[in-house]
Amino acid sequence: MSGNSGSNQMWGGRFAGGPSAIMREINASIPFDKALWRQDIAASKAHVDMLGAQGIVSAEDAALIASGLDQVAAEYEANGVPENWDLEDIHMTTESRLAELIGPAAGRLHTARSRNDQVATDFRLWVRDAMDQAELGLKQLQVALVSRAGEHAASIMPGFTHLQTAQPVTLGHHLMAYYEMIGRDRSRFADARVRMNRSPLGSAALAGTGFPIDRFRTAEALGFDGPTDNSLDSVSDRDFALDYLMAAAQCSLHLSRLAEEFIIWASQPFGFVTLPDSLSTGSSIMPQKKNPDAAELVRGHSGRIVGCLTALMITMKGLPLAYSKDMQDDKPPVFEAASLLALSIAAMTGMVAEAKFRTDRMRAAAELGYATATDLADWLVRQANIPFREAHHITGSAVKLAESRGIALDQLSIEDLKAIDERIDERVYAALSVEASVAARCSHGGTAPDEVRKRVAQARVALGLEESA
């Protein structure tokens, strides 16, 4: 849309002329804030109900306005929200359509309210919904992780540090590590939700209002725990959006790490997993290719989500109290991050649930890289009463010898081992299998299969999949 127009009927009384084409274009937020229409209708209905209850508007006008808002909502649901840049945003778009439907009574809706507290309320409601959706999606991802971990509580694979073979672990233990990460993500969203669940509605432009409103009534109607306590802070606060983005960014990092592992595991040199066809793509030139594109996009999306957080932090860093138009730019990064996060959660949930783990390849890989070297050192500590640092040195010598011969530790003869340290005897071989290694890691939170099964059982109770014994 371009060109000049008449002065805006919502605020144009003190202007001699209308905004220029560039002003209309830079000022319009309806292309993106139309996403708030459900929240805007809900907040307006709560507001007009309160106005009627307080006698600020007549009961007849309050009922007429509420009915009209329902009509507007039905139109939006059926046909979408129209984009008229002259009306700037979702608030004025809705009020304008309401006036067309019910006449002058629509003008009473904005009594004791400003767009400043209106948008702060709408946006909080939207972010609260986004937090709830993220929490639900993450719970489903946890369900998938716990289910697969239970299947593979005893499936042995190499554990890595620096992407080098470190110690044998079980696949179930590895998957439960992500269960823990995702649990922390859920708690971050839950914590943020508690902090943000106060209603700014009724703060008006910045100083409150002289009308005898009941902010507790509107807060309760909208599911808030109560009203905010400072009108200046209420209209200028975007901490709730930043809290959401911080939680989303941290969550996206965890999803990216999980995606990266699936990408590595699906590569031919590893061959630990076959990804579902439904979450993979092919090559336009190489017929044999099966690319982990969904996982790669999850990994890429994490960068964009972190960028959304950075964008809003920079927008907010130097704003004086109270409202500034810069804050109109608060919504696009939140909307983008929420969309990307939802896609990423869904993709990784499907990947975990449908992946085919090649446990034979994992088991074979666990035999490589002298993964049971620590078990030899631990055996020396327990059986020969050797200080760990000395045992570490002895084990290093054994690894060096085995490596020079191209064999595994348990393929060294007892004579070879005794030549390194005469305190070693045949009992050591029982400690050098990968099965013995994982079984020995039975400390709380360890990789021993029984310990993994215990953690899985506790997780199933926590997720509501079964009752506590």
Curated annotation (Swiss-Prot):
Belongs to the lyase 1 family. Argininosuccinate lyase subfamily. PANTHER family: ARGININOSUCCINATE LYASE. CDD domains: Argininosuccinate_lyase. The keyword Repeat does not apply. Pfam families: ASL_C2 (PF14698), Lyase_1 (PF00206). The gene is argH. The lineage of its organism: Bacteria, Pseudomonadati, Pseudomonadota, Alphaproteobacteria, Sphingomonadales. Pathway: Amino-acid biosynthesis; L-arginine biosynthesis; L-arginine from L-ornithine and carbamoyl phosphate: step 3/3. SUPFAM superfamilies: L-aspartase-like (SSF48557). InterPro entries: Arg_succ_lyase_C, Argininosuccinate_lyase, Fumarase/histidase_N, Fumarate_lyase_CS, Fumarate_lyase_fam, Fumarate_lyase_N, L-Aspartase-like. This is Argininosuccinate lyase. The keyword Amino-acid biosynthesis applies. It is found in: Cytoplasm. NCBIfam families: argH.
